[in-house]
């Protein structure tokens, strides 16, 4: 998550380099670690080909929002600037590499996913090497993530959709097995249900089918997915087979030889990167680092499970 200026524009250093992502990352790492949450970061790899259309659409929307932001800026309309700025967030390859370096400087593991980060993180949780995935992307459940935690937000608030106001939020634990039991379906049926409604690989889903109808159809057809998607008129909505999307969720590339190693905070590296290179306040950065040291002295970190008992 990035931190922005009052008008919604990105924070930059004296050389004009964007620093919002680094400020947001530092603040989040510091805050969550001080709440006894042991973090590891998984980064996206190569997106599946079927996701390219969704990514292109997102890119177009951000370009359009940027144009509207510039028009609002010309009129000095701060409210509109904030509104459209929130829709323009884009991470360049350079920004992502900087984020990885900062995470490593804080002594936290960086795992590179071959493809989708949610899929890789799901494997790590399934293997018992982490408590849960901190994500607001429910697609992680389609990759069989046993637990996800939504709204892991340091401020305890988030922006309301298409509004300038905020709402108070709390961490929300979602357990896959409990939800499958509640819905009365299995894992493969959950994937089929999501495909009817729409995923990153078949954006928009099947026209005219909402969550309630999708659940009813999935229960009616059981595991006869050929019949299900024929009834749903998949070929009339997409120019690729339903199996292409289904197989992505079932067989997406994952790195089984990942390594989770936590190290000491490299204060010199953090100071060099944030203070020397990007003009961060030395006092503020030192304060964040000292907060981490205090947490470490108080005892062993216990993990996200402490939030939920």
Per-range role (PLM):
Residues 165-309:
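Non-catalytic nucleic-acid-binding/docking modules located in mid-to-C-terminal regions
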Residues 68-82, 160-177:
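Charged, glycine/proline-rich intrinsically disordered loops and linkers
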Residues 15, 140-143, 154-165, 173-180:
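Conserved NTP-donor binding/palm subdomain of two-metal-ion nucleotidyltransferases/polymerases, i.e.
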Residues 133-134:
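Residue-level marker for buried hydrophobic side chains located in beta-strands
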């Amino acid at each position: 998550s990035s931190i922005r200026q009052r008008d919604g524009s990105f924070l930059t250093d004296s050389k004009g380099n964007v620093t919002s992502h680094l400020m947001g990352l530092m603040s989040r790492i510091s805050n969550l670690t001080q709440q006894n949450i042991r973090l590891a970061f998984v980064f996206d790899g190569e997106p599946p080909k079927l996701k390219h259309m969704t990514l292109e659409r997102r890119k177009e929307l951000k370009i359009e929002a940027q144009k509207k932001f510039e028009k609002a800026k010309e009129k000095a309309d701060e409210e509109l600037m904030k509104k459209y700025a929130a829709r323009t967030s884009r991470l360049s390859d350079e920004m992502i590499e900087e984020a990885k370096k900062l995470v490593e400087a804080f002594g936290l593991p960086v795992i590179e996913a071959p493809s989708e980060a949610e899929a890789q993180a799901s494997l790590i949780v399934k293997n018992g090497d982490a408590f849960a995935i901190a994500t607001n992307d429910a697609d992680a459940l389609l990759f069989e993530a046993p637990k996800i935690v939504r709204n892991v937000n340091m401020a305890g608030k988030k922006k309301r959709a298409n509004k300038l106001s905020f709402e108070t939020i709390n961490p929300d634990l979602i357990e896959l097995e409990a939800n499958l039991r509640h819905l009365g379906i299995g894992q493969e049926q959950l994937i089929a249900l999501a495909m009817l409604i729409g995923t990153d690989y078949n954006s928009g889903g099947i026209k005219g089918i909402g969550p309630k109808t999708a659940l009813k159809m999935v229960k009616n057809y059981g595991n006869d997915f050929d019949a299900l998607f024929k009834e749903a008129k998949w070929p009339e909505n997409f120019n690729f087979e339903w199996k292409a999307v289904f197989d992505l969720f079932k067989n997406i590339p994952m790195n089984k030889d990942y390594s989770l190693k936590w190290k000491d905070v490299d204060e010199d590296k953090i100071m060099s990167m944030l203070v020397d290179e990007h003009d961060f306040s030395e006092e503020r950065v030192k304060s964040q680092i000292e907060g981490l040291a205090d947490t470490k002295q108080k005892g062993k970190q216990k993990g996200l499970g402490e939030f939920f008992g």
